[in-house]
Design a protein with these regions (language model features):
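Extracellular loop-to-transmembrane helix junctions
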Residues: 27, 54-79, 93-97, 104, ...
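Juxtamembrane transmembrane-helix boundary signature
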Residues: 39, 66-99, 108-114, 153, ...
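Extracellular/periplasmic helix-exit of transmembrane alpha-helices
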Residues: 74-87, 231-235, 240, 260-288
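Transmembrane alpha-helical segments of multi-pass small-molecule transport proteins
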Residues: 107-113, 134-156, 174-179, 335-351, ...
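Hydrophobic alpha-helical segments and their helix-loop junctions in multi-pass secondary transporters
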Residues: 154, 173-199, 211-228, 381-389, ...
Length: 427
């Protein structure tokens, strides 16, 4: 009798374990997701908003394929950054800090800090413009508000509250998605024209220059530095982590989903402009684009767009400051208070908002500075993920390394072209 009972209990337990196992795996995967969504915010910042709307308004659906190609390259680069962080347990700035001499660390930090300032410039200006559009606030006042609110968000970025920070940023990313896609429900595009835009082609020199600008600005330096940090900050001190293999598998899904979402937002912006703003003038600035959207699609869609822009600014400026803090920590081994890092990058943006007659010009300059910083982030990343002493059994194989180098070389070359064209006044 007792043996029968024991046998029955064992059967029930086994059935319970089998039924619980899929949930456990799914729950474990859900626990890994998050870092890539925070990094993906860099791909839907105000600078990208302006570029995608300008492309659609000028050239219609012609350059849809450029965004798709750009997104594919972004997936590869961001996964490499996550992989480096997962396997080594260190961020890219930390590894650079260990391998460079004192002078090299300082020089590398200086260029990275300039990149962080240029990044924040675009985010804060975009947010100030959104507050001006929504509430009629002066740009300087709007910039101060963006700085203050983003600083509050950064309170949650470390330790046990890091998951809260991730959820806040992901929430803002969803607001961005709705804000920038809403217009498509009012004026849906022609699917045939969208599909036709997937065929790689150009029409004149101007479209080549625009494609170069879009591809060249694909990868944001701070997103590369930060992603290798985020995968480790995702877990609180003392919290058990899955195995490296499980983390890498989860990271692939995390990166794919996050950048599909970010890529869809960028694609929606281009399609919205191609469908509703094609041929209209004045859409080469964020403010002009919003007014055009409001004129064509109505005040409700215009307001929703402005809210999306505000969410874009708040999330991207918070993530940019987070990246700057980690760069300082990794390269200089200084753990400065987050508010201090926030002030360093915020002040230049506020100065521009106070004195500049046309903030859009500052955005262009900032884009050039970002282009200069790309090689400093992407070349070390590709070098270290191919370093067996760092990566061990997870080192990139020869074929993957060749693909990585080809993508990195293309991005760096395009950024060099973008810099030259901008300096010549042609981009």
């Amino acid at each position: 009798m007792k043996d029968d009972m024991d046998s029955k209990n064992m059967t029930i337990t086994a059935q319970h374990d089998r039924s619980a196992r899929p949930y456990h795996h799914g729950h474990a995967l859900a626990g890994i997701l998050g870092p890539a969504f925070v990094a993906a915010v860099a791909y839907v910042d105000p600078g990208n908003v302006a570029a995608n709307i300008t492309s659609g308004a000028r050239y219609g659906y012609l350059l849809v394929w450029v965004l798709v190609l750009a997104n594919c390259m972004s997936v590869l680069i961001q996964y490499q950054s996550a992989k480096l962080g997962i396997v080594t347990g260190k961020s890219l700035p930390e590894i650079l800090g260990e391998r460079l001499g004192d002078a090299g660390r300082f020089m590398f930090f200086m260029q990275a800090e300039v990149i962080a300032i240029a990044t924040d410039l675009a985010e804060v200006i975009g947010g100030a413009i959104s507050l001006k559009l929504l509430f009629g606030l002066p740009l300087f006042v709007g910039g101060c508000i963006i700085g203050a609110v983003s600083t509050v968000l950064l309170i949650f970025e470390k330790g046990a509250t890091h998951r809260i920070f991730e959820k806040l940023i992901i929430g803002l990313l969803l607001v961005i998605t709705f804000g920038f896609i809403a217009g498509l429900f009012i004026a849906p595009p022609n699917p045939k024209e969208v599909v036709a835009g997937l065929i790689p082609r150009f029409k004149g020199t101007d479209t080549v220059l625009m494609a170069t600008s879009m591809l060249g600005a694909t990868v944001m330096p701070h997103a590369i530095y930060l992603h290798s940090t985020l995968v480790n900050d995702h877990y609180a001190p003392g919290e058990a982590k899955p195995s490296i293999k499980k983390l890498l598998h989860g990271s692939k899904i995390d990166v794919a989903w996050a950048l599909i979402l970010a890529g869809s937002v960028n694609l929606a912006l281009l399609i919205l402009a191609a469908n509703s703003l094609y041929g209209m003038t004045g859409t080469d600035t964020i403010e002009g684009a919003q007014r055009a959207i409001q004129h064509v699609l109505g005040p409700v869609i215009g307001t929703i767009f402005s809210i999306g822009l505000l969410a874009s600014s708040l999330s991207s400026t918070s993530v940019g400051t987070y990246a700057g803090s980690e760069i300082m920590h990794g390269l200089l081994r200084i753990k400065a208070p987050m508010w201090a890092c926030r002030v360093v990058t915020l002040v230049p943006a506020l100065v521009v908002l106070w004195f500049a007659n046309n903030p859009t010009e500052a955005l262009i300059v900032g884009q050039v500075v970002l282009s200069v910083g790309i090689p400093f982030a992407i070349i070390p990343l590709m070098r270290y993920t191919h370093d067996r002493t760092l990566m061990g059994e997870y080192v990139d194989g020869p074929v993957k390394h060749v693909v990585n180098i080809a993508v990195a070389a293309l991005i760096v070359a395009l950024n060099v072209v973008l810099i030259v064209l901008t300096m010549l006044g042609k981009a």
